Each structure stands twice: as structure tokens, then as C-alpha cells.
């Protein structure tokens, strides 16, 4: 499925709502599981978005790392709802997709899948459209390889992809893919879903 189609599904999906405004839906196509995570849609989301001091985080017995505290709180609310589907042995490929606030959750979801399904590490993919920074601290190769197949999609000038500030120790993980042209949109308009979709479709022509 091409990025424009994934993004459209993410923006227009019907979501299951959990505690702390962590919203998701899943789709099974053949042996592929798609996990979609929703953007901000209320005051609780913004409280979590702005709660950005870093905190230790880890899945199970894996080595811990530091992440945006608010996003970790929301992800912990979503994780139990996905455990059964992720563990299903008939699932042979997993794709995580998120936009904005949901893209930050997709970063955490992707790492969760990497740990929960070591048999699928070469068959997991992730897409964070308009993704904020989630990771904090030194970028050790043994740690960042967890996101080797995760793509941060940035519409150039998108302000959300530049927060929290790198000066505070935050950084993106995975591969950065830039779309659009610098100066085409204001920093806020570059984050709007209709403009991201327009640039994705333009790139697929």
C-alpha cells in the first residue's frame, strides 16, 4: 500500500478510544496487520503532547531508553489492546501508521512490535506522518536499529516535526523522508492533512 493511501486511511479511519485519549484501529489484509494511530483531537491529547520531559521507557526485558513522557503515557494505554493481534502467529507482516500525535505513538508501537515479534524484524514497517520527536538522549546504534524500517514523513516546513526542540536532547528515529517544497506552505499549513496528502500524491504521480 502506497504512503498516500496509508495516510488517507489513517486520517479517515474509525477509531477505538482508550484511556488517556490513545486512539487506534487495526486492519488485517491477508497475513499483514496494519495498526493505525490517531492524531490529536481534544484537550487531553494536547496536555500529553506538551508533557515532554523525557522518562525511561522499555518493553518487557529489553534495554531501556528515554522518551517523551506524555507520549509514553498514552502509548501504555493503547498497548494492551494490541497484544493479542500482534502476537497472532498467522500475522507475518506488521505496518504501523500514525499522523501527528498518532505518529509519535507509531514510533512507540513500532518499537513494541520489534520487541514482541523478533521473528518479523525484517517484515515490519512504520510510517510517521508529521511526526514530533519522541526519542531523547544518545543515539546508540544497538538502540536506533529498532527503527531501521520506520519512516518519518515531513512536509517541508512542518512545525510539528521540529518539536520538542533538538536543543533539549530530542531527535527523530528511523529514516527522514521530506516531501513538498520549502516555502510552499507556512509552518502550520505544512502540517495540515490535506496538504500532506496533496504532496504525497504529487510524489506518487
Residues of each region from the PLM?
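Non-catalytic, mobile gating and regulatory segments of ester bond hydrolases
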Residues: 1-97, 101-205
Amino acid at each position: 500500500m502506497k504512503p498516500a493511501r496509508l495516510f488517507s486511511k489513517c486520517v479517515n479511519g474509525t477509531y477505538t478510544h482508550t484511556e488517556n485519549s490513545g486512539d487506534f484501529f487495526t486492519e488485517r489484509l491477508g497475513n499483514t496487520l496494519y495498526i493505525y494511530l490517531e492524531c490529536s483531537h481534544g484537550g487531553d491529547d494536547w496536555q500529553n503532547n506538551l508533557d515532554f520531559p523525557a522518562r525511561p521507557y522499555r518493553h518487557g526485558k529489553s534495554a531501556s531508553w528515554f522518551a517523551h513522557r506524555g507520549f509514553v503515557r498514552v502509548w501504555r494505554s493503547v498497548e494492551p489492546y494490541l497484544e493479542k493481534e500482534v502476537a497472532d502467529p498467522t500475522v507475518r507482516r506488521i505496518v504501523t501508521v500514525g499522523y501527528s500525535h498518532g505518529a509519535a505513538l507509531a514510533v512507540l508501537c513500532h518499537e513494541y512490535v520489534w520487541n514482541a515479534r523478533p521473528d518479523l524484524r525484517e517484515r515490519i514497517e512504520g510510517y510517521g506522518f508529521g511526526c514530533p520527536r519522541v526519542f531523547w538522549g544518545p543515539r546508540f546504534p544497538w538502540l536506533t536499529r529498532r527503527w531501521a524500517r520506520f519512516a518519518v514523513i515531513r512536509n517541508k516546513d512542518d512545525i510539528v516535526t521540529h518539536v520538542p526542540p533538538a536543543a533539549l536532547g530530542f531527535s527523530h528515529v528511523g529514516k527522514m523522508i521530506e516531501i513538498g517544497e520549502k516555502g510552499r506552505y507556512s509552518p502550520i499549513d505544512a502540517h495540515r492533512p490535506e496538504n500532506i496528502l496533496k504532496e504525497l500524491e504529487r510524489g506518487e504521480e
